[in-house]
Amino acid sequence: MNLLQNVSLASYSGMAVGGNAAYLTEVANRMEVLEALSWAQGQQLPVIMIGSGSNIIWRDEGFPGLVMVDKIMQFEIYQEDETNTYLTVGSGENWDSVVARSVEAGLTGIEALSLIPGTAGATPVQNVGAYGQEIANVLVTVEAFDTHVRDFVTLPAGDCGFGYRMSRFKTVDRGRFFITGLMLHLTKGNPQPPFYGALETYFEAAKTMLFTPAVVRDAVISIRSAKLPDPAVIHNNGSFFANPIITDEQYNYLADNYDAVPHWSVGTGTVKISAAWLIETAGYKDIHDAETGMATWAKQPLVLVNEHAKSTADVLTFKAKIVTAVQQKFNILLEQEPELLP
């Protein structure tokens, strides 16, 4: 085991801030996971396992234990027939590469999740979703090390506690499981309309008539690239807030007082509305905050970017300003998407 000490965690966060880890090591397979966990147990140290860190914000105090960086790679067809394909995917695989390879194979089910940063193992934690698709719809099982039983377990998708941008891995069992692999169920053939709003608008403008996984992927990449900053160039965690789900009564109040509130019906008595619209309408579109060195991205206020912030405290202060502004104007509480660790 190659063990590093006193490592800056800013390099393992999309926002590029945070303190140091006492220890850090990379793990490339299950045996290395066990070796690292055994060492940490012997030292009586806490352990966190991360992917690329694209959806992580580290506290300024750092982490006084062992950080395992996931490098578990696998992309294999487990089983297939004329219609269905089951893929086994290592948790350390770059997610967009997984999407690209599945699309190249003519498989549909995750093409709308193109260009989402991070690793495959992070997708169930957040129940990653975009443009009408989400990981819960295609996930069969999650393979993980369960710290309660000190062994590897296989969890069916139905046991993952999925909700909107939510899972048991993020809530009741936060920190319990170290995800090492996924099984995905994708299908052969083409996705069928109707498509999610922005995609449908894109296809109508392009007069697209044939919808293949590759066509949808290209469209999503075009849409996302036009409005989102490149995380390799500009430090950010992607969408910083989840779209709130509110009651019909709350939505009706908004609709009566504002024009064209972006919204989606998500069930009886509830409506999902655009967090970006709330932030913009509350006065935080293209805001550059001198106090914190943070900003909202000009083309998408849902994305907070680190222009010259020096600490996680700066990020959280700017976040609090936005949350307060939205709550005061709409009485709606925005919820943070990136995970604050530890």
Predicted regions and their residues:
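Generic structural marker for isolated residues within well-ordered, non-membrane alpha-helices
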Residues: V98-V99, A275, V323
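Phosphate/pyrophosphate- and phosphate-bearing ligand-binding catalytic cores of soluble enzymes
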Residues: L4-Q5, A10-V17, F152-D314, K329-P342
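Residue-level signal for inorganic ion chemistry
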Residues: N29, G53, G118, R150, ...
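Anion-binding (especially nucleotide phosphate/pyrophosphate-binding) glycine-rich loop
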Residues: M1-V149, D159
